[in-house]
Each structure stands twice: as structure tokens, then as C-alpha cells.
């Protein structure tokens, strides 16, 4: 399975680092093994937050639906809102099981996931959304991540 793989919404929304590893650690064999593992878990769509379109064509060739929303260095509220809406739209299909990934599970990704839980109205308490993500990931969210969670 990919490094740092976690279900955020069991059987529906997951997160991990880049399939096959990121940067210099990426390996084709590892990527192929992780793709097979993801398929065995029912994942059928990849939502990439990578700056480049790295591997999107490969994902499409093996049957994944792909989404690409490059997340730059300075994440704006506007770009996060676009990402929240895109995730919501992707998950509106009951058959879709979505994996969100970036090169590494960095500071922004947990904030985006907690923020999505609020944005989509699955949760209505930003502090509870933060707590849920901290429990799932087994680590506290950074101030940078917390800043991405919408307040009501």
C-alpha cells in the first residue's frame, strides 16, 4: 500500500503520499504494486495535488479517473475552495472511491481534508474536524493546516 495511506471516510475518501513514492524515491515497480493494492481496496479515482501532472496518464491507462489541482507553495482560500468543490463533485458519484495524494503528506493536505469535512457539511464543528484528522493521522495538525479549515 502507498506510504501514509489513511481512509478519511471509510470506503469513500482516502489520502496517501504520491503512488510509488515521491521525488527521487519513485519507482515503477513500487507504483504498479501500489496501484494494484489501491484497486483491491476499491479505489477508482485519483485526485492529485502535485504541481506537475506526474503519472496521471499512467493512472488513466490502468482505469483510474483522474483529477488534477496543483497546490502551489502559498495556498490561497480561493484555491482551497475550488479544491473543496472539486472533491465534493467527485464524491457526488456514489460509485466513486477517491484517493487524494501529494508528493508527501505535508502540512496542507490534512488541513484540506479537515476543511472538506466542514465544507461538505459532513461535520459542522471545525475543532471536531481537526480532532478527527489528528486521530486518523496519528499526529497534530500544524498551524498551516488549521488555517485551511473553514470556520462557521
Regions flagged by a language model, labelled:
Residues 106-112:
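Glycine-rich nucleophile elbow surrounding the catalytic serine of serine-hydrolase chemistry
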Amino acid at each position: 500500500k502507498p506510504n501514509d495511506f489513511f481512509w478519511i471516510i471509510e470506503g469513500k475518501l482516502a489520502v496517501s503520499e504520491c503512488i510509488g513514492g515521491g521525488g527521487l524515491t519513485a519507482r515503477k515497480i513500487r507504483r504498479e504494486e501500489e496501484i494494484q493494492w489501491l484497486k483491491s481496496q476499491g479505489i477508482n479515482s485519483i485526485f492529485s495535488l502535485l504541481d506537475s501532472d506526474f503519472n496521471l496518464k499512467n493512472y488513466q491507462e490502468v482505469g483510474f479517473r483522474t483529477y488534477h489541482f496543483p497546490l502551489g507553495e502559498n495556498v490561497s482560500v480561493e484555491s482551497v475552495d475550488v479544491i473543496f468543490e472539486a472533491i465534493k463533485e467527485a464524491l457526488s458519484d456514489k460509485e466513486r472511491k477517491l484517493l487524494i495524494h501529494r508528493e508527501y503528506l505535508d502540512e496542507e493536505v490534512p488541513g484540506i481534508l479537515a476543511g472538506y469535512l466542514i465544507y461538505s457539511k459532513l461535520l459542522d464543528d471545525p475543532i471536531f474536524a481537526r480532532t478527527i484528522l489528528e486521530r486518523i493521522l496519528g499526529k497534530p495538525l500544524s498551524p498551516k493546516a488549521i488555517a485551511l479549515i473553514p470556520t462557521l
